[in-house]
Amino acid sequence: MKQYLDLMKHILAEGVDKSDRTGTGTRSVFGYQMRFDLSKGFPLVSTKKCHMRSIIHELLWFLKGETNVAYLRENKVSIWDEWADDNGDLGPVYGAQWRSWPTQSGDAIDQISQVIAQIKSQPDSRRLIVSAWNVGELDKMALAPCHAFFQFYVADGKLSCQLYQRSCDVFLGLPFNIASYALLTMMVAQQCDLALGDFVWTGGDTHLYSNHMEQTALQLSREPMPLPTMTILRKPESIFDYQFDDFELTNYAPHPHIKAPVAV
Protein backbone atom coordinates (compact mmCIF):
# COMPACT_ATOMS: atom_id res chain seq x y z
CA MET A 1 0.00 0.00 0.00
CA LYS A 2 2.71 2.42 -1.02
CA GLN A 3 -0.03 4.63 -2.53
CA TYR A 4 -1.47 5.22 0.94
CA LEU A 5 1.89 6.19 2.44
CA ASP A 6 2.56 8.47 -0.54
CA LEU A 7 -0.73 10.27 0.18
CA MET A 8 0.30 10.83 3.80
CA LYS A 9 3.64 12.25 2.66
CA HIS A 10 1.87 14.51 0.16
CA ILE A 11 -0.43 15.93 2.83
CA LEU A 12 2.47 16.61 5.19
CA ALA A 13 4.51 18.28 2.44
CA GLU A 14 1.85 20.14 0.46
CA GLY A 15 -1.17 20.42 2.75
CA VAL A 16 -2.57 23.51 4.43
CA ASP A 17 -3.65 23.82 8.05
CA LYS A 18 -7.42 24.20 8.39
CA SER A 19 -10.06 24.33 11.08
CA ASP A 20 -12.89 21.80 10.92
CA ARG A 21 -16.35 20.92 12.24
CA THR A 22 -14.96 18.89 15.14
CA GLY A 23 -12.66 21.65 16.40
CA THR A 24 -9.63 19.36 16.20
CA GLY A 25 -7.79 20.97 13.29
CA THR A 26 -6.41 19.29 10.18
CA ARG A 27 -3.67 19.39 7.59
CA SER A 28 -5.52 19.11 4.31
CA VAL A 29 -5.20 18.83 0.53
CA PHE A 30 -8.04 19.09 -1.97
CA GLY A 31 -8.31 16.58 -4.79
CA TYR A 32 -6.25 13.38 -4.80
CA GLN A 33 -6.57 10.05 -6.59
CA MET A 34 -5.27 6.52 -6.07
CA ARG A 35 -5.76 3.42 -8.21
CA PHE A 36 -5.61 -0.21 -7.07
CA ASP A 37 -5.55 -3.18 -9.46
CA LEU A 38 -7.76 -5.66 -7.64
CA SER A 39 -6.37 -8.57 -9.63
CA LYS A 40 -3.00 -8.05 -7.91
CA GLY A 41 -4.13 -8.40 -4.32
CA PHE A 42 -6.54 -6.98 -1.79
CA PRO A 43 -5.76 -3.33 -0.91
CA LEU A 44 -5.63 -3.56 2.88
CA VAL A 45 -3.15 -1.30 4.67
CA SER A 46 -0.33 -3.30 6.28
CA THR A 47 1.70 -0.58 8.02
CA LYS A 48 -0.78 -0.93 10.86
CA LYS A 49 -3.22 -3.73 11.60
CA CYS A 50 -6.71 -3.05 10.23
CA HIS A 51 -9.81 -4.64 11.75
CA MET A 52 -11.17 -6.53 8.74
CA ARG A 53 -14.02 -8.01 10.76
CA SER A 54 -15.41 -4.51 11.36
CA ILE A 55 -15.01 -3.62 7.70
CA ILE A 56 -16.95 -6.69 6.55
CA HIS A 57 -19.74 -6.30 9.09
CA GLU A 58 -20.13 -2.60 8.30
CA LEU A 59 -20.45 -3.35 4.57
CA LEU A 60 -23.01 -6.10 5.20
CA TRP A 61 -24.90 -3.64 7.43
CA PHE A 62 -24.95 -1.05 4.63
CA LEU A 63 -26.24 -3.67 2.19
CA LYS A 64 -29.02 -4.67 4.60
CA GLY A 65 -30.24 -1.08 4.40
CA GLU A 66 -30.03 -0.72 8.16
CA THR A 67 -29.38 2.54 9.99
CA ASN A 68 -29.52 1.36 13.59
CA VAL A 69 -26.29 0.13 15.17
CA ALA A 70 -27.90 -2.93 16.80
CA TYR A 71 -26.50 -5.33 14.16
CA LEU A 72 -23.03 -3.83 14.55
CA ARG A 73 -23.13 -4.05 18.33
CA GLU A 74 -24.29 -7.68 18.15
CA ASN A 75 -21.12 -8.36 16.17
CA LYS A 76 -18.88 -6.33 18.50
CA VAL A 77 -18.37 -3.48 16.02
CA SER A 78 -18.38 -0.07 17.69
CA ILE A 79 -17.22 2.24 14.89
CA TRP A 80 -20.59 4.03 14.64
CA ASP A 81 -21.37 4.29 18.35
CA GLU A 82 -20.15 7.89 18.73
CA TRP A 83 -22.84 9.15 16.34
CA ALA A 84 -25.81 6.98 17.36
CA ASP A 85 -28.61 8.34 19.54
CA ASP A 86 -29.84 6.68 22.73
CA ASN A 87 -31.84 4.16 20.68
CA GLY A 88 -28.91 3.35 18.40
CA ASP A 89 -30.39 5.24 15.46
CA LEU A 90 -28.35 7.28 12.98
CA GLY A 91 -31.05 8.66 10.72
CA PRO A 92 -31.15 7.94 6.96
CA VAL A 93 -27.40 7.30 6.48
CA TYR A 94 -25.70 5.06 3.91
CA GLY A 95 -27.86 1.95 4.16
CA ALA A 96 -31.09 3.91 3.79
CA GLN A 97 -29.86 5.80 0.73
CA TRP A 98 -28.34 2.73 -0.94
CA ARG A 99 -31.45 0.56 -0.47
CA SER A 100 -34.43 2.93 -0.15
CA TRP A 101 -33.78 6.37 -1.62
CA PRO A 102 -37.13 8.18 -1.21
CA THR A 103 -38.89 9.60 -4.27
CA GLN A 104 -41.36 12.47 -4.53
CA SER A 105 -44.19 10.00 -5.15
CA GLY A 106 -43.55 8.28 -1.84
CA ASP A 107 -41.85 5.25 -3.35
CA ALA A 108 -38.27 4.15 -2.68
CA ILE A 109 -35.41 3.25 -5.03
CA ASP A 110 -33.14 0.31 -4.23
CA GLN A 111 -29.99 1.70 -5.84
CA ILE A 112 -27.94 -1.45 -5.23
CA SER A 113 -30.43 -3.78 -6.93
CA GLN A 114 -30.85 -1.24 -9.69
CA VAL A 115 -27.15 -0.81 -10.45
CA ILE A 116 -26.50 -4.58 -10.49
CA ALA A 117 -29.39 -5.06 -12.94
CA GLN A 118 -27.96 -2.27 -15.09
CA ILE A 119 -24.45 -3.76 -15.06
CA LYS A 120 -25.89 -7.06 -16.30
CA SER A 121 -28.15 -5.56 -18.97
CA GLN A 122 -26.29 -2.37 -19.98
CA PRO A 123 -22.61 -2.83 -19.08
CA ASP A 124 -21.54 0.13 -21.23
CA SER A 125 -23.90 2.53 -19.49
CA ARG A 126 -22.35 5.66 -18.03
CA ARG A 127 -25.06 5.75 -15.37
CA LEU A 128 -23.86 2.86 -13.19
CA ILE A 129 -23.97 5.08 -10.13
CA VAL A 130 -24.98 4.86 -6.47
CA SER A 131 -25.24 8.02 -4.37
CA ALA A 132 -25.54 8.43 -0.61
CA TRP A 133 -25.60 12.24 -0.85
CA ASN A 134 -29.32 12.97 -0.54
CA VAL A 135 -29.50 16.74 -0.11
CA GLY A 136 -33.10 16.58 1.09
CA GLU A 137 -32.22 14.32 4.01
CA LEU A 138 -28.79 15.54 5.12
CA ASP A 139 -30.21 17.35 8.14
CA LYS A 140 -31.78 14.09 9.37
CA MET A 141 -28.47 12.19 9.31
CA ALA A 142 -26.25 11.81 12.36
CA LEU A 143 -23.28 12.27 10.03
CA ALA A 144 -23.38 13.45 6.42
CA PRO A 145 -21.96 10.85 4.01
CA CYS A 146 -18.18 11.08 3.66
CA HIS A 147 -17.92 8.42 0.95
CA ALA A 148 -20.72 9.98 -1.00
CA PHE A 149 -20.89 8.64 -4.55
CA PHE A 150 -19.57 5.65 -6.50
CA GLN A 151 -19.64 4.54 -10.12
CA PHE A 152 -19.03 1.21 -11.80
CA TYR A 153 -17.33 0.73 -15.18
CA VAL A 154 -17.18 -2.41 -17.32
CA ALA A 155 -14.47 -2.95 -19.95
CA ASP A 156 -12.92 -6.13 -21.40
CA GLY A 157 -15.02 -8.28 -19.10
CA LYS A 158 -13.68 -6.55 -15.98
CA LEU A 159 -15.54 -4.51 -13.38
CA SER A 160 -13.98 -1.36 -11.96
CA CYS A 161 -15.34 1.04 -9.37
CA GLN A 162 -14.55 4.67 -8.58
CA LEU A 163 -15.50 6.26 -5.27
CA TYR A 164 -15.72 9.99 -4.63
CA GLN A 165 -15.11 10.77 -0.97
CA ARG A 166 -15.95 14.38 -0.16
CA SER A 167 -14.20 14.26 3.24
CA CYS A 168 -11.51 11.82 4.30
CA ASP A 169 -9.86 11.13 7.65
CA VAL A 170 -6.72 9.62 6.13
CA PHE A 171 -5.26 7.99 9.23
CA LEU A 172 -8.34 6.33 10.72
CA GLY A 173 -11.01 6.23 8.03
CA LEU A 174 -9.32 5.76 4.68
CA PRO A 175 -7.94 2.23 5.21
CA PHE A 176 -11.50 1.14 6.03
CA ASN A 177 -12.97 2.92 3.01
CA ILE A 178 -10.50 1.44 0.52
CA ALA A 179 -10.98 -2.09 1.82
CA SER A 180 -14.77 -1.75 2.02
CA TYR A 181 -15.24 -0.57 -1.55
CA ALA A 182 -12.68 -3.04 -2.88
CA LEU A 183 -14.70 -5.81 -1.25
CA LEU A 184 -17.98 -4.40 -2.57
CA THR A 185 -16.48 -4.37 -6.07
CA MET A 186 -15.49 -8.01 -5.67
CA MET A 187 -19.02 -8.94 -4.58
CA VAL A 188 -20.69 -7.08 -7.44
CA ALA A 189 -18.23 -8.55 -9.94
CA GLN A 190 -19.05 -12.05 -8.71
CA GLN A 191 -22.79 -11.40 -8.95
CA CYS A 192 -22.37 -10.09 -12.51
CA ASP A 193 -19.91 -12.81 -13.65
CA LEU A 194 -17.16 -10.28 -14.33
CA ALA A 195 -13.43 -10.33 -13.61
CA LEU A 196 -11.83 -7.75 -11.33
CA GLY A 197 -10.60 -4.44 -12.68
CA ASP A 198 -9.48 -1.42 -10.67
CA PHE A 199 -10.73 0.34 -7.59
CA VAL A 200 -10.17 4.07 -8.02
CA TRP A 201 -10.35 6.30 -4.95
CA THR A 202 -10.88 10.05 -5.41
CA GLY A 203 -10.76 12.36 -2.42
CA GLY A 204 -12.10 15.88 -1.91
CA ASP A 205 -11.01 17.41 1.42
CA THR A 206 -8.35 14.84 2.23
CA HIS A 207 -6.82 15.41 5.65
CA LEU A 208 -4.77 14.28 8.59
CA TYR A 209 -6.10 15.42 11.96
CA SER A 210 -3.65 17.43 14.06
CA ASN A 211 -3.84 14.83 16.84
CA HIS A 212 -2.83 12.03 14.44
CA MET A 213 0.60 13.41 13.52
CA GLU A 214 2.66 11.19 15.84
CA GLN A 215 0.76 8.13 14.66
CA THR A 216 1.29 9.16 11.04
CA ALA A 217 5.04 9.50 11.59
CA LEU A 218 5.15 6.04 13.15
CA GLN A 219 3.26 4.56 10.23
CA LEU A 220 5.55 6.24 7.71
CA SER A 221 8.54 4.66 9.44
CA ARG A 222 7.25 1.18 8.62
CA GLU A 223 7.75 -0.80 5.43
CA PRO A 224 4.55 -1.97 3.71
CA MET A 225 4.09 -5.73 3.43
CA PRO A 226 2.89 -7.65 0.33
CA LEU A 227 -0.84 -7.36 -0.32
CA PRO A 228 -3.01 -10.08 1.20
CA THR A 229 -5.59 -12.15 -0.69
CA MET A 230 -9.33 -11.89 -0.19
CA THR A 231 -11.37 -14.91 -1.30
CA ILE A 232 -15.16 -15.10 -1.54
CA LEU A 233 -15.93 -18.70 -0.60
CA ARG A 234 -19.34 -19.02 -2.24
CA LYS A 235 -21.63 -17.23 -4.66
CA PRO A 236 -25.02 -16.57 -3.06
CA GLU A 237 -28.12 -15.93 -5.14
CA SER A 238 -28.11 -12.20 -4.37
CA ILE A 239 -25.77 -9.41 -3.33
CA PHE A 240 -27.86 -9.25 -0.15
CA ASP A 241 -27.29 -12.88 0.84
CA TYR A 242 -23.58 -12.72 1.68
CA GLN A 243 -22.63 -13.61 5.24
CA PHE A 244 -19.55 -12.82 7.28
CA ASP A 245 -18.16 -16.35 6.90
CA ASP A 246 -18.24 -16.07 3.09
CA PHE A 247 -15.02 -14.02 3.15
CA GLU A 248 -11.52 -15.32 3.80
CA LEU A 249 -8.49 -13.04 4.17
CA THR A 250 -5.14 -14.80 3.82
CA ASN A 251 -1.48 -13.76 3.84
CA TYR A 252 -2.16 -10.62 5.85
CA ALA A 253 0.92 -9.91 7.98
CA PRO A 254 0.55 -6.32 9.17
CA HIS A 255 2.59 -4.23 11.55
CA PRO A 256 1.00 -3.70 15.00
CA HIS A 257 -2.16 -1.65 15.46
CA ILE A 258 -1.73 2.10 16.08
CA LYS A 259 -4.33 3.70 18.34
CA ALA A 260 -5.63 7.20 17.56
CA PRO A 261 -8.57 9.32 18.77
CA VAL A 262 -11.71 9.71 16.64
CA ALA A 263 -12.80 13.26 15.82
CA VAL A 264 -16.55 13.45 16.43
From Swiss-Prot:
Pathway: Pyrimidine metabolism; dTTP biosynthesis. The active site is at 146 (nucleophile). CDD domains: TS_Pyrimidine_HMase (cd00351). This is Thymidylate synthase. (6R)-5,10-methylene-5,6,7,8-tetrahydrofolate binds at residues 51, 169, 263. GO terms for molecular function: thymidylate synthase activity. Belongs to the thymidylate synthase family. Bacterial-type ThyA subfamily. GO terms for biological process: dTMP biosynthetic process; dTTP biosynthetic process; methylation. It comes from the Bacteria. Signal peptide: none annotated. DUMP binds at residues 21, 126-127, 166-169, 177, 207-209.
